[in-house]
Amino acid sequence: MREDEVLSFKARHGVNTAGHSIKTVRVLPFLITAKTDHADASYNKLILEQGELSSVFYLKPKDTHIKNPSNSKSNQRMNFLMSSTFTHYGNASYNQTILQKDAHISMGVENTYDLALNGAPYLIGAIATYGDSTNNSLNIEAGSSVEFFTSLPKKDKNGNNTFDERITHLVGGLAYQGNVKNNKIFIKDANMIIHGPSKAYASLAAAHISAGYIDSGTDKNFQASKNLLDIDGFNLDMYMNHDKQPLAYNSVLFADFWGGKTEQGQALDNTINLKDIKNLKKDKNNENIFAQALFNFYAGASNNGEANYNTLNIELKHPLEIANNFLGYNQHSFYGGFATKGANHNTINIKNDLTTTDLSQSYKDALNIVAARTLEGSADYNKVYINNSMSTLPVYIYTAKKNILNNQDFYPSSANNNEVVIKDFASFRNLTVLTEAKEASYNTINYNNVQSITDVSNIDKGSKIIIRALDKANHNTIDIKNYSSNAADNAYLIMAYNEAAYNKIIINDTLFGVASDKREGILSIIAGLSNNAHDNTLIINNLNLDEYKNNNSIFIAPSAITGLSEAKSYNNTLYIGGNLNIFKN
């Protein structure tokens, strides 16, 4: 490698996976079909087949026993680019990188002994620097494979894992200081391998996979729009550098997926289609040897800007699997729009079962479904639709949510006209739907034939529907039909500090109970809870209440006040009809 082959850029994605400050990134065009300087490039292809692409400096022979080399490390921090096209001050369009059957990517380490990291491998459809990347694609076809190497995480100040940036990246269209549009990644029955070092019995790895990605080293805005990530066969596998098989070994892959992502600007109209993703691989002869992946999916994301009109479609052929990994928890997250300055008109569609039989129990277990996440700005017109599905992890659904950074609370300025519709769904832990903002109005949450089942032995965090505003919560509707929940804490509330008005909760054919042998729990149903609660309506038809042995356990009212001397409640209405079955004691 000659130094004059290396390019340097001011960028944000460089030192660790969570960093957003501007720093210098060094880039090496490692394997490029077409490279231009101050010119555009189109219709180029890079096809990899029947071979291994490796960055290894020393390859230990498999058929000869020799002494391992000294454990020296170059500690390089380079982005190794493998792409059909590389433009410097030019646009890249309609280019393809194709990974075919028996092609194997093993980039990012300098030896096969301790797997010391020596760079961040980028497998890309096309890359444009100081230009736009449009209509490019990365195809990872059946029978191909990509390796992910160990990357030890550190905890940031918010308690999140942050990895060394020298991890594997798969990108459809990449731009430095440019826009990305209509780029695609197709993953079809491909093998994704966690490669662990010798003398280890547990390992962590990380991966970034994005159909369109923009890195930026200035304050100028760039747009990631209409990019598509399509996954129909992400098959997790593992490889260990042990001379003989250990008694136990556990690898965990943290994988982040984006339809479109920008460091600075807007993420608009990006899509993820998630069809088949196998996240657990066990050894045939020893179930104590296994690899597992924990996922975050973001249809559209901006680290400094808005995320609007993005869509995440989940229709899994096989549900995600759960395992008792060495981390002690199972957690997956799905985001429609992830932003800092506004997230609107984002949609999450879910069909078919989400997870398999529950083996794990931890306070950290979660299936997070977040239509909109933003630190400020509006979170309006976001939607979550779930139909004919099941989860054995606790389910937390947010149309808009509070965020805590550096011990400070951040709320969207508004959460209006959001919608959650859940039909024919069972959660075998807890089910919670939350909307949190400074103002929340005209939101709708609808259940039809939904179960929230809590086993006695499970860690019970309660099942809830809560619309909560710091200022006003008006004209919201919670409509529940054919619903049952036996969580210890059932709460169905519309609440705001200053005003809760013209809200409506409708409950038809519903059962509330407690799974615990103690038969102790809390049930709260209040259509308007505020310092000023008025014109709220609670309608109940055919309600079944199981045994609650503890006192002060059931609160059902169209409105309630906070207890302040100036608080007021008026013009609220309660309707109760049909069969009201209450446990005799």
What is each model feature region?
Residues 1-169, 173-296, 300-333, 337-552, ...:
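Surface-exposed loop/turn motifs in large extracellular/passenger domains
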